[in-house]
Amino acid sequence: AAANTYRKIFDHFTPDKLIGFTATPNRGDKVRLDTVFSKIIFQRDLRWGIEHGYLCDIFCRRVNIGYDLSHVRTQRGDYAPGELEEAMEGTADAIAQAYRELATGATLIFAVSVHHAEEIAKRIPGAVVVTGETKDRAAIIKAFTAGEIPCIVNCMVFTEGTDIPRVETV
């Protein structure tokens, strides 16, 4: 709602009351939602969602895929894209190996670039790459949801507002 596209809609229609719902209140661009909404009237946290069955429990494993971010600069609170891609060069084999050893069921993998996504997907049988340029995204999600695709490797697509209940491993 804090994005310019939404703000233009709000400005155009000038609603008397504006109510917002979000599962991702902490935006990547650091724009605060209180610039759009004056107060929070109801909220639940991650723990509440898990305890009440709205979200699945979390099981985390740290996997060493052989990267070094010590020389990667940050820009506006995120890693510099070109530098991050360079730092992640050569990690596709380790990511595919971690997938084979640890993934349970439908898997969603996040890559740092389109090239990185393609390199990872090449190493995972049946994996499909989804990027901002993917034309048949809805068909891919439908096939993934139906169990026809075991793994989606994406680059900057499934970051906010994604709801694919079949995903078991990220």
How does the language model describe each region?
Residues 2-60:
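Post-DEXD/H (motif II) to motif III coupling segment of the RecA-like Helicase ATP-binding lobe
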Residues 10-15, 54, 100-102, 143-146, ...:
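Conserved catalytic network of the ASCE P-loop NTPase/AAA+ motor domain
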Residues 15, 23-28, 48, 64-69, ...:
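Conserved nucleotide-binding/hydrolysis micro-motifs of P-loop NTPases
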Residues 17, 150-151, 169:
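Short, Asp-centered acidic motifs that coordinate Mg2+ and/or phosphate
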Residues 40-111:
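Conserved interdomain linker/interface between the two RecA-like ATPase lobes of SF2 helicase motors
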Residues 108-110, 116-121, 125-162:
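Conserved helicase ATPase core of P-loop NTP-dependent helicases/translocases
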Residues 164-170:
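TOPRIM-like Mg2+-dependent DNA-processing core and adjacent phosphate-binding/basic surface
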